[in-house]
Amino acid sequence: MPLYSQIRQSEDAFSEPTYAATNELINDNENACPHCRQERSESWFLKGGRSIVYVSLTFFVVSIGLNFILAILLYSKFHASSFQTEWSAAVADTDCVRRLVAYTPALDSIEYFATNLRDAYRSNDQYLGPPTKEREQMWQDLWLHEAIMVETWAMPLLNRINLDPYEKVEGELGDGYNALLQVHHQLGCLDILRQYTWLLSGKYTTDGIPVPIFLQKPPEENRRHVDQCIEELRMGLMCHGDMTPLLITKKRDGASGFKADMNTHYMCRNFTKLQEWTMSHGVEHWELGDGRGPHEHGRR
């Protein structure tokens, strides 16, 4: 068939061809030239294929970029000190403490340091042994301090809305309520347990070291007080749940069958700094046995 199947002879020979006529002409041309249809099909495929390739490459590059950013964010989260100066890392530690502890006015005094436990707190047995005047005083120096103040605005941070049961700070020292730090209460409880064991052993006498003020009660009341201290220490230990590994040595102990390395590596709080803060922020001195001291359990 000829390339053009007909030559217009009518008066509209030079008028614009209709869509049908144009389509017929294209079909006639492709019928006359079969490879034209194939070229048109291949051209469309190549153009469409390039688009798919471009989209795939773009998606791949974006995915790699997002994964890279995510990796940096995760690394910076778990290795923050790698991206911080020493000063900014210290600030981050303070922020961490604020998130992990209940409110305390002594927050800014909390400072951590890495140490082996016994290397930092070994006392050369100064706190051990039967009661002496010096030993009793050393124990009291650990825990018997003035009350500190929790300001009124901060009481809801301790989940306390009804403030009627709590003792207000007297005078012009501030608008707040008397409190003591839990560590001092726990050390006081430990001291009472120590004293109770020596009391049962007959080591406190009227002509030597007198019976501690908190244990000058009938035996059943003393026992009840000691039980309360045991319960306080149990709850405190369970609440804080120290998960520091206690390594087992190759040595064997006759009683338990194993011997642990008690000089455990710890992140400890600077106890000296806590003591200094407490002594500099005292608002009321409690005399032993005045009915309001740190170990009058259940009294307000």
Curated annotation (Swiss-Prot):
GO terms for cellular component: membrane. It is a single-pass membrane protein. The lineage of its organism: Eukaryota, Fungi, Dikarya, Ascomycota, Pezizomycotina. Its main location: membrane. This is Transacylase cctO. Pathway: Mycotoxin biosynthesis. InterPro entries: UstYa-like (IPR021765). It is found in: Membrane. GO terms for biological process: mycotoxin biosynthetic process. Disruption phenotype: Leads to the accumulation of isocyclochlorotine. Transacylase; part of the gene cluster that mediates the biosynthesis of the mycotoxin cyclochlorotine, a hepatotoxic and carcinogenic cyclic chlorinated pentapeptide. Within the pathway, cctO catalyzes the intramolecular O,N-transacylation from isocyclochlorotine to cyclochlorotine. The NRPS cctN initially catalyzes the condensation of L-serine (Ser), Pro, L-2-aminobutyrate (2Abu), Ser, and beta-Phe in this order to produce isocyclotine. GO terms for molecular function: transferase activity. It comes from the Eukaryota. The chain crosses the membrane at residues 52-72. A motif (HXXHC 1) lies at residues 185-189. Its EC number is 2.3.1.-. The keyword Transmembrane helix applies. A motif (HXXHC 2) lies at residues 225-229. Glycans are attached at residue 270. It holds the Pfam family UstYa. It comes from Talaromyces islandicus. Belongs to the ustYa family. The 2 HXXHC motifs are conserved in ustYa family proteins and might form active sites. Within cctO however, the second His from the 2 motifs is not conserved. Keywords: Glycoprotein, Membrane, Transferase, Transmembrane, Transmembrane helix.
